């Protein structure tokens, strides 16, 4: 009887319902002067992910990229893209679900966000910008370790008190 109950547990399911651009911004605050200078930029990439439960087994994941290019001490451009997706995810344990929302879904969204950034930079008439792949699995593992360390720190302080 227990075997039948275990077999009736929901098998893991993952479906992409939709991938869409949630927000886009491109600024060239120092144009046209920035185009007159030799192009030797310092490019900085900041990224963030967040997720929200929309319904039972339905989640929105948003990957935010901010790319800032500094050239000759001035901001050449600032590009912000929020690439989002709606995913149906069922039959996973809490740790598996957290990994899916924090690493697997952002891995799916990143190529779309990278293309949007590249397109916006090109439309700004700047040289082509190819963002390197991001290891979201490693970033998520680092995030989990930081959370565990933060949770352990207060417990250690209480034990010493």
Swiss-Prot record:
Keywords: Chaperone, Cytoplasm, Protein transport, Translocation, Transport. One of the proteins required for the normal export of preproteins out of the cell cytoplasm. It is a molecular chaperone that binds to a subset of precursor proteins, maintaining them in a translocation-competent state. It also specifically binds to its receptor SecA. This is Protein-export protein SecB. The gene is secB. It holds the Pfam family SecB. SUPFAM superfamilies: SecB-like. It is found in: Cytoplasm. It comes from Shewanella sp. (strain ANA-3). One of its GO terms (cellular component) is cytoplasm.
